[in-house]
Amino acid sequence: MNLEKFNSLIELFFYQAEKQDSKSIFLQWLNPNNNKTFTWEETKLNIFKISKIIKENIKEGDRCLLVSENRPEWFVSDLAIMLSGGITVPAYTTYTEDDYKYLIDDCEPTIIIVSNNEMLKKLNATINQKNFIKKVITFDEIEKSHHNLNINNKDKYLDFNFILKNDLSEKDKIQNVNLKRSSAACI
């Protein structure tokens, strides 16, 4: 395979996905408590679905903060951000609330994607103070008792798995990738 012909990681992923058996496993949890797997086709569709939501809420070049441990949803989110024209700002899960506040103040993300309630608790005080954050997407369902999280605007929060249940139109499945080799990429 000649990598010179690919302008971006997302373009390379779509090329590889088209060559694979749609039912072959591409991503899998390494957590022994979760045996969830994702085929190449599911992964591709999930990237389109998350990208659709991101595109509706960002302009090209906007930052999207990604706070998660290594898991399949991280990969899907990173490629969805790239497909949307956003820039992934990855963050360690070991940061403190002050670290996250500094990072959010510095990069001013339009979207924050966060893995679980524990991480969301560290971020939420800052999220509630910042008007530039349009959406927060969570991999794990937000705790039913919102008082623990002090969520001011419930419409700002989206559930990753709920987004994945949505259908896509054919136009949403177009791999319209306007990325160049010089475009920013999180690797």
Which stretches of residues belong to each language-model region?
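Conserved AMP-binding/adenylate-forming
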Residues: 36-38, 51-95
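Short beta-strand elements of ligand-binding domains
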Residues: 68, 91-92, 133-142
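Conserved pre-ATP/AMP-binding loop-to-beta segment of ANL
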Residues: 23-25, 156-158, 162-187
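Adenylate-forming
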Residues: 13-17, 27, 43, 47, ...
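Helix N-cap/beta->alpha junction signal
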Residues: 68-70, 115-116, 140, 183
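Conserved ATP-dependent adenylate/AMP-binding module captured primarily in the ANL superfamily
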Residues: 95-126
